[in-house]
UniProtKB/Swiss-Prot annotation:
Residues 63-231 are annotated as: Disordered. The gene is bcl7a. This is B-cell CLL/lymphoma 7 protein family member A. Residues 174-185 have a biased composition (Low complexity). Residues 95-105, 113-147, 158-173, 222-231 have a biased composition (Polar residues). Signal peptide: none annotated. Residues 186-199 have a biased composition (Basic and acidic residues). Belongs to the BCL7 family.
Length: 231
């Protein structure tokens, strides 16, 4: 009998301890941090606040096994799920009506700053997109400029080659013209010299015919005259 009484006492103590622990856990679960206004003033404090929701006696839902002493949680019923949904809706409504969303100078300034920063952040990608959209045009211009420069270089090379060819051909033509002029001048000189020689011979023959003496005799006579003069 003594052993059974001891076991019963330990079971009751364990049950009490478990109840205390669960109560402490439930208290922690039903508390949350929120911004709360102090009275009628605009002062707000961020502190722990109990969750405003309908109380459900979890102790009634818990079933203890007398043999094992363990706690068993039954499956949630439809009513409990409906209550949970209601509590979630209430939480959402309370968050909407909490002092966080209430209008005040400090919070309005903070919200304005946040909205300005978000607008700047939203505008910056648009600017980047615009710059990226505008940037291909210079790339196209740059790509067309080298093509135009290459065409110009090719045209310049072709013009230079044509000029060189024309200069070479003009040089050859001038050289051939100078050679032809030199040849013609040489021919003219030879012709004039031949004409002069022929005229000189003709004049000598005419003089000889006028004197009536052959040229050899005349040469002898000319040579004898200086001798006579010397005598």
């Amino acid at each position: 009998m003594s052993g059974r009484s001891v076991r019963a006492e330990t079971r009751s103590r364990a049950k009490d301890d478990i109840k205390r622990v669960m109560a402490a856990i439930e208290k922690v679960r039903k508390w949350e941090k929120k911004w709360v206004t102090v009275g009628d003033t605009s002062l707000r404090i961020y502190k722990w606040v109990p969750v405003a929701e309908p109380k459900v006696d979890d102790i009634d839902l818990k079933v203890t096994d007398e043999n094992s002493g363990l706690l068993r949680r039954p499956k949630p019923s439809a009513k409990k799920t409906k209550n949970k949904k209601k509590t979630k809706d209430d939480k959402c409504g309370s968050e909407l009506t909490t002092p966080e969303n209430s209008s005040s100078p400090g919070m309005m300034d903070m919200q304005d700053d946040c909205s300005n920063q978000s607008s700047i952040a939203d505008a910056s990608p648009v600017k980047q997109e615009n710059s990226s959209n505008c940037s291909p045009a210079p790339d196209q211009n740059v790509s067309t400029q080298p093509e135009g420069s290459e065409v110009k270089l090719e045209e310049g090379h072709s013009n230079a080659s044509e000029q060189q060819d024309s200069e070479v051909s003009s040089g050859q033509n001038s050289h051939s013209s100078t050679e032809s002029s030199l040849n013609s001048s040489e021919k003219a000189d030879t012709q004039t010299s031949g004409d002069k020689d022929s005229t000189m011979e003709a004049s000598k023959n005419s003089q000889d015919s006028d004197d009536g003496t052959p040229p050899c005799k005349k040469a002898k006579g000319d040579s004898s005259q200086p001798n006579n003069d010397g005598i």
